[in-house]
């Protein structure tokens, strides 16, 4: 099992959101070893954890607050998830063809919390290939008029390792 702690930024954003909003459903998209899923489930949130790797999912899905699904989100004629969530978390996952699908997972008055690598990360490590790195302010620009951006950061982060990332919190205000 991976022992990396959840992203402090993700944890802080969830705490800010949950102080002011009733949260019933959270989805962790491309969750890997589930560092965010486990953290949130241990805080008694109901979490849906999605990943392509069953072996990774198997390491943490014995938690009663986690429902998991092994899905390849990049190999479907249709988007396999047909639900809405109060919080949608995406960390270190980038498949541009799914931006619209990810946005559509967010309930009205729900939140998208997205953190991933961007151009500039090449000097710090993987990923280095352009197709796995967001362009300048790209994450900020994926939202449409159904969303209000609550927080955006682009720059260096130091934990767990030094990297160059974009981080976004957006609230869905319309369906």
Where do the model's predicted regions map?
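S-adenosyl-L-methionine
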Residues: 1-21
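Conserved class I S-adenosyl-L-methionine
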Residues: 23-32
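Conserved SAM-binding motif I beta-strand of class I
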Residues: 46-51
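Conserved SAM-binding strand-loop segment of SAM-dependent methyltransferases
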Residues: 63-76
């Amino acid at each position: 099992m991976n022992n990396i702690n959840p992203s402090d930024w993700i944890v802080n954003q969830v705490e800010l959101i949950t102080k002011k909003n009733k949260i019933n459903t959270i989805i962790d998209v491309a969750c890997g070893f589930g560092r965010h899923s486990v953290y949130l489930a241990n805080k008694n949130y109901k979490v849906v954890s999605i990943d392509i790797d069953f072996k990774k999912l198997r390491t943490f899905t014995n938690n009663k607050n986690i429902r998991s699904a092994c899905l390849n989100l990049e190999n479907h004629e249709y988007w396999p998830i047909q639900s809405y969530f109060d919080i949608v978390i995406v960390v270190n996952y980038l498949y541009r063809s799914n931006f619209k699908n990810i946005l559509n997972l967010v309930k009205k008055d729900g939140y998208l919390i997205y953190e991933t690598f961007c151009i500039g990360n090449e000097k710090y490590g993987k990923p280095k290939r352009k197709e796995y790195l967001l362009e300048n302010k790209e994450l900020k620009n994926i939202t449409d008029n159904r969303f209000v951006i609550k927080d955006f950061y682009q720059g260096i982060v130091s934990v767990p390792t030094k990297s160059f990332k974009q981080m976004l919190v957006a609230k869905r205000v319309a369906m």
